[in-house]
């Protein structure tokens, strides 16, 4: 599994409730840009439309060599999931305070572009502070243990 892009902001901003692996409907120029790692998913989110799930606001840069057949960088991309997973996501999207965001984009072992999406709930400011405090304490513990050896 070759990770192309990771949404580190999502892991800090949200509590992750459940994760799914989804395929994406992409154009050939988009796949070539993904192979060059020219993608940004930090502002992306998932929306339900006509009983399908769509990925919005994911930026895949235009591929230089594809002149006329190029794609729009921020176009909507359809996500490929099983029907049960789609129904579960749609139910969660309609719940207040819950959203679905991509966590990472990668190529699987067969060479297909996949995205890991998650059902998330927003953190409050004090939750973010607690996360920072815990991270700093873990770093301090590792420093102390290295110095004692």
Swiss-Prot record:
What domain of life does the UniProt record list for this protein's source? Bacteria
The terms describing its cellular component in GO are: cytosol
* MF terms (GO), sorted A to Z: RNA binding
Q: Report the principal subcellular site.
A: cytoplasm
Xref: Pfam families: SmpB
Keyword list, A-Z: Cytoplasm, RNA-binding
Work out whether the entry's keyword set contains Hydrolase: no
Its BP terms in the Gene Ontology are: trans-translation
The record ties this protein, via InterPro entries, to: SmpB, SsrA-bd_prot
Which locations, inside or outside the cell, does it occupy?
Cytoplasm
Asked if the Swiss-Prot or TrEMBL record annotates the protein with the keyword Cytoplasm, the reply is yes
CDD domains given in the database record: SmpB
Query: What's this protein's function?
Result: Required for rescue of stalled ribosomes mediated by trans-translation. Binds to transfer-messenger RNA (tmRNA), required for stable association of tmRNA with ribosomes. tmRNA and SmpB together mimic tRNA shape, replacing the anticodon stem-loop with SmpB. tmRNA is encoded by the ssrA gene; the 2 termini fold to resemble tRNA(Ala) and it encodes a 'tag peptide', a short internal open reading frame. During trans-translation Ala-aminoacylated tmRNA acts like a tRNA, entering the A-site of stalled ribosomes, displacing the stalled mRNA.
Annotated family = Belongs to the SmpB family.
Indicate what this protein is called per its UniProt record. Answer: SsrA-binding protein
| Annotated organism of origin | Wolbachia sp. subsp. Drosophila simulans (strain wRi)
Encoding gene per record: smpB
């Amino acid at each position: 599994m070759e990770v192309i892009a990771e949404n580190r902001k999502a892991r800090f901003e949200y509590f992750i409730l459940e994760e799914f692996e989804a395929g994406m409907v992409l154009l050939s120029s988009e796949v070539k840009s993904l192979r060059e790692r020219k993608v940004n998913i930090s502002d992306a989110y998932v929306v339900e439309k006509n009983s399908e799930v769509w990925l919005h606001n994911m930026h895949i840069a235009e591929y230089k060599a594809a002149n006329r057949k190029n794609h729009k960088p921020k176009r909507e991309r359809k996500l490929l999931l099983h029907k049960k997973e789609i129904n579960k996501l749609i139910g969660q999207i309609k719940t207040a305070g819950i959203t679905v965001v991509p966590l990472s984009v990668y190529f699987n072992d067969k060479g297909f572009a996949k995205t890991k999406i998650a059902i998330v709930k927003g953190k409050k400011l004090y939750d973010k502070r607690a996360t920072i405090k815990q991270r700093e304490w873990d770093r301090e513990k590792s420093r102390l243990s290295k110095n004692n050896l």
